[in-house]
């Protein structure tokens, strides 16, 4: 892995972070992603690039990608509310979603920039993705159908809500 002294630090990603607590405008280029991943690594996980393990890189990458998903989520929710659009709500007792990091990166169009951002620190995106556990919620056909249904809606930028019933001691 490269020497910490030659790589951007979390302070470089956001020098006013402590003073303003305002998020950076999120760019989708490799430079911005690299800085934000390091910021997550430092301020969310308490690690430096020199001591971070592969799981730390996975967590930091997930957090940086999640921020972009939240930006899209807030924007689309505001648009749906403003336009008073209809919504699709899907209720499922089981839900086989699989691994989400690769899907999220692809749906945001960030596959190459994230790969380049991690490569700057000697980290391979393919190895990071393998660390994500499969959620394995549910046990079969309907769960897989729910996941496919939602994935197709996400890939086509269709606004939807997923509701999941939790059973506790026989009560929903």
Question: PLM features: residue spans?
Answer:
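A conserved hydrophobic secondary-structure block that centers on an alpha-helix together
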Residues: 143, 148-151
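Flexible loop/turn segments at secondary-structure boundaries
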Residues: 97-100, 144, 169
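The substrate-binding groove and active-site-proximal loops of carbohydrate-active enzymes
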Residues: 135-139
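Anion (oxyanion) recognition and catalysis
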Residues: 154
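Conserved small/polar residues in nucleotide/adenosyl-binding loops
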Residues: 161-170
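Residues forming anionic-ligand binding surfaces in small-molecule and nucleic-acid pockets
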Residues: 115-134
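Extended, charge-enriched "interface" segments that sit outside catalytic cores
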Residues: 2-83, 87-97, 101-108
């Amino acid at each position: 892995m490269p020497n910490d002294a030659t790589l951007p630090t979390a302070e470089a990603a956001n020098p006013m972070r402590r003073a303003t607590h305002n998020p950076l405008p999120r760019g989708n280029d490799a430079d911005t992603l690299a800085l934000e991943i390091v910021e997550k690594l430092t301020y969310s996980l308490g690690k430096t690039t020199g001591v971070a393990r592969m799981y730390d890189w996975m967590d930091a990458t997930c957090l940086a990608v999640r921020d972009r998903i939240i930006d899209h989520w807030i924007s689309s929710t505001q648009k749906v509310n403003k336009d008073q659009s209809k919504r699709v709500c899907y209720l499922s007792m089981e839900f086989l979603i699989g691994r989400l990091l690769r899907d999220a990166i692809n749906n945001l169009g960030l596959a190459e920039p994230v790969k380049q951002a991690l490569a700057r620190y000697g980290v391979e995106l393919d190895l990071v993705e393998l660390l994500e556990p499969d959620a394995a919620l549910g046990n079969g056909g309907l769960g897989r159908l729910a996941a496919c249904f939602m994935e197709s809606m996400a890939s086509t930028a269709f606004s939807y809500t997923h509701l999941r019933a939790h059973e506790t001691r026989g009560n929903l």
